[in-house]
Amino acid sequence: MAKQIQAIRGMNDILPTQSPIWQKLETVLRETVSAYGYSEIRTPIVESTDLFKRSIGEVTDIVEKEMYTFDDRNGDSLTLRPEGTASTVRAGNEHGLLYNQEQRLWYMGPMFRHERPQKGRYRQFHQFGVEVYGIPSADIDAEVLMLSAMLWEKLGITEHVTLELNTLGDSEERAAYRDALIAFLEQHKDVLDEDSQRRMYSNPLRVLDSKNAAVQALLADAPALMDYLGEETRSHFSHLCELLEAVGIQYTINPRLVRGLDYYNRTVFEWVTSSLGSQGTVLAGGRYDGLVGQLGGKSTPAVGFAMGLERIVLLLQTLELDKDIKPAVDVYVTAMGDSCRVEAIKVAQDLRASLPNLKVMSHCGGGNFKKQMKRADKSGAAVALVIGEDELANNQVAVKYLREDKAQELVARDALATYIAELV
């Protein structure tokens, strides 16, 4: 017997029993961005490695440790995309979508990072994101946060997520703070762990995000970024907070929130949950006004966010919010005997034509009544339609309830669609 091939570690199959919750989530995402007038953009899975080195930053964990990178047959270095923002900017620059224009875009698709697989985090994962270009004001920052809040409301998880905000200032403000932070860290180098010492000069703001308890205790006395921000940055952030309060979105200001990607400036945010253990972030984003220019375009203000769908699916399952999702089948059609099979097929087709949203499965492969009812029950359908010799002769269909303790009913063939529509 040939050796069975397994999926690559960290790259998981989504099986038919798991698909309904994914489909529900994807439907909510599409409906919500549509309600805000956003347009979909689809970019390639494989991009030039240089795109991510220039956008994410060469000294980030993603570029240093996590990217799937290879040389193609022409010797070009290519990478499976680890996130969606850089590809969206590249496409916008390449096709002239961004300069002197406003664009509200969204994307959804697989991303790849070679990190340690754990619950809710995989090497291939699915990411949904929104990106807005050409609007510098705080009202668009508020809009993307309002959009994300609407997602939680539609998914029924508003009470289980909280919003954390911070502002990183512009490049000059951040540079001044960076120098002050390095000077502070140099005085306490003996307290820093190996990872923080490595980041101290290459990306010191990431030290603020350290999970080491001793480092966090030290940072309580570190210079505060807020002390290095100018009036314009403070005004932008203050206006954002006022808008969120006006629409009833609660938030917490977290001065340690810096985000793991180099391109962020001013507003940064995360939606977090305590329902998934230590890995609590379910959505993150912020403003990245310099990235379009950094990747060869004209300077363009931008803001956006991304979320990993596996994390949201896990949260929905943890909260048992996947229990009410409708099964893949509403009605299962059976035929008792060879002479009834053609009529059963016609009944199923007529129902699909009359009720486009109805999910109808026809039994195939023959079998006795017991076998067909077993298949009907396994399908998850609410009812089975039974067509036997008597039903065929009387132009009727028997409706057998699979999830309720109700007696079987006979329904006239020409009234069946109306009956089923009221039923399901």
UniProtKB/Swiss-Prot annotation:
HAMAP family: His_tRNA_synth. It is found in: Cytoplasm. One of its GO terms (cellular component) is cytoplasm. Its EC number is 6.1.1.21. This is Histidine--tRNA ligase. One of its GO terms (biological process) is histidyl-tRNA aminoacylation. Homodimer. It comes from the Bacteria. PANTHER family: HISTIDINE--TRNA LIGASE, MITOCHONDRIAL-RELATED, HISTIDYL-TRNA SYNTHETASE. Pfam families: HGTP_anticodon, tRNA-synt_His. Its main location: cytoplasm. One of its GO terms (molecular function) is histidine-tRNA ligase activity. It catalyses: tRNA(His) + L-histidine + ATP = L-histidyl-tRNA(His) + AMP + diphosphate + H(+). NCBIfam families: hisS (TIGR00442). It comes from Shewanella piezotolerans (strain WP3 / JCM 13877). Belongs to the class-II aminoacyl-tRNA synthetase family.
